[in-house]
Amino acid sequence: MLEQLAEECTELAKAALKMARIIRKENPTPVTEKEAIANIREEYTDVVQCAGELSLTVDEEQMARKHERWGKRVRDRT
């Protein structure tokens, strides 16, 4: 199951990178934005499914800290 999780994470990364290409309008792809969003959702679902099968859970405290750091980065850019 760990190999499956790694594979699904890789597919999610690829889907996210394709969406980034669409947003930046660089390195054209025949995939539409709607298709890219659907693909991200599908791959994310696969990652969550694998994580569930492995009984992985979210660390809420870590998520809160990360949320604060990301928010600070956004505020600092503006």
Language-model regions, residue ranges each:
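Flexible "arm" and connector segments at domain edges
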Residues: M1-T78
